[in-house]
């Protein structure tokens, strides 16, 4: 085999091995099995929202595993195709192998981006808000164009979209819209879209056909996950027992059945004395403590989300321009990635921008 080709094939295989390691195929298979078991429950659809989330996560993770298996098979098949074509002197076979090698590189690069999503919230679903900014009716129309772009992107990947709110402008377009993309890693992927987007075109709303510049802001936040159960390590609590007391402080129990639990890391204290036994009072107190810790956790998450809103990727940062006139070009101002077909981009073909943005963000974090 040609040494350059052999080295290239080895690099492709090594890249795939790295992806398989980061994505942890054993853990991925275990998660799929867990979701399949959940999806098979007869009472699953009693909670429609939960059922839809389980179904979406199952489809997404099955797709991830299938992609990796397909890529592994393609790497192996490509090596065989090169060997057979070289042995038989088949030029058309070699040309086919070269073409497949180029495609395989591109597909591996796209999947490799997924391994860069390792932030605290990256694995979560996303809530996207789009608002018209400067530019009047053109800005409102642009906001609607952007919403369609993201919805089409989600549809291309078979990600469910749930629209929370749309506020329509008087003449055309949207004042604002908020929607949720129900797919794992939607936040990590779409968060690079946060910022101000700029549109330059001949305005369809201008009677004189003048060129107009308008702006729309995109905000991307992770979905706060509901937690049904809070684990409390035994080492994190101190349990004190005392006699139950009634009106006026008088003892109503001759045994020390009442329980007071102190959560050492937070200082939260709860007590229970209404149950008949110490074990029952402890169990009840633990349930109260779990509720208090869950409420505290959600308060902290809300504060963290507020901090994300004020992070560097703010609304005021112009990050992409969509030029429809006098030439046609969509260009990311951070990564320099550009596409000369705005129609395709506005129809949801934005994976190139997302991949470039994720790589750029990783470089910025490492700097």
Curated annotation (Swiss-Prot):
Keywords: Cytoplasm, Methylation, Protein biosynthesis. It holds the Pfam family PCRF. This is Peptide chain release factor 2. The keyword Acetylation does not apply. NCBIfam families: prfB. SUPFAM superfamilies: Release factor. GO terms for cellular component: cytoplasm. The modification N5-methylglutamine is found at residue 250. The keyword Protein biosynthesis applies. Peptide chain release factor 2 directs the termination of translation in response to the peptide chain termination codons UGA and UAA. GO terms for molecular function: translation release factor activity, codon specific. PROSITE patterns: RF_PROK_I. It comes from Saccharopolyspora erythraea (strain ATCC 11635 / DSM 40517 / JCM 4748 / NBRC 13426 / NCIMB 8594 / NRRL 2338). Methylated by PrmC. Methylation increases the termination efficiency of RF2. Belongs to the prokaryotic/mitochondrial release factor family. The gene is prfB.
């Amino acid at each position: 085999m040609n040494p350059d080709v052999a080295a290239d094939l080895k690099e492709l295989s090594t890249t795939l091995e790295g992806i398989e390691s980061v994505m942890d195929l054993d853990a991925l298979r275990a998660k799929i099995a867990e979701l399949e078991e959940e999806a098979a429950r007869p009472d699953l659809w009693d909670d429609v929202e939960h059922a839809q989330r389980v179904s979406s996560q199952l489809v997404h993770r099955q797709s991830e595993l299938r992609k990796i298996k397909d890529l592994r098979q393609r790497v192996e098949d490509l090596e065989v195709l090169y060997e057979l074509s070289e042995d038989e002197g088949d030029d058309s076979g070699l040309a086919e192998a070269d073409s497949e090698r180029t495609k395989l590189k591109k597909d591996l690069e796209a999947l490799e981006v997924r391994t860069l999503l390792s932030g605290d919230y990256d694995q979560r679903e996303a809530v996207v808000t789009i608002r018209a900014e400067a530019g009047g009716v053109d800005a409102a129309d642009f906001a609607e164009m952007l919403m369609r772009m993201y919805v089409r992107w989600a549809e291309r990947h078979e990600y469910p979209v749930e629209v929370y709110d749309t506020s329509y402008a008087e003449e055309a377009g949207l004042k604002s819209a908020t929607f949720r993309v129900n797919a794992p890693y939607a936040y990590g992927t779409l968060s690079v879209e946060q910022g101000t987007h700029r549109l330059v075109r001949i305005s369809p709303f201008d009677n004189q056909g003048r060129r107009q510049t308008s702006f729309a802001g995109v905000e991307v936040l992770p979905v706060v996950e509901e937690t049904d159960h809070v684990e409390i390590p035994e080492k994190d609590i101190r349990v004190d027992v005392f006699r139950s007391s009634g009106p006026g402080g008088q003892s109503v129990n001759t045994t020390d059945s009442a329980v007071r639990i102190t959560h050492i890391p937070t200082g939260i204290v709860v007590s229970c004395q209404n149950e008949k036994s110490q074990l029952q009072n402890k169990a009840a107190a633990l349930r109260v403590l779990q509720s208090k810790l869950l409420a505290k956790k959600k308060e902290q998450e809300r504060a963290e989300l507020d901090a994300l809103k004020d992070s560097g990727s703010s609304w005021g940062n112009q990050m992409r321009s969509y030029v429809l006139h006098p030439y046609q070009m969509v260009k990311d101002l951070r990564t320099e990635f550009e596409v000369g077909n705005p129609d395709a981009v506005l129809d949801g073909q934005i994976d190139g921008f997302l991949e470039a943005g994720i790589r750029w963000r990783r470089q910025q974090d490492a700097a």
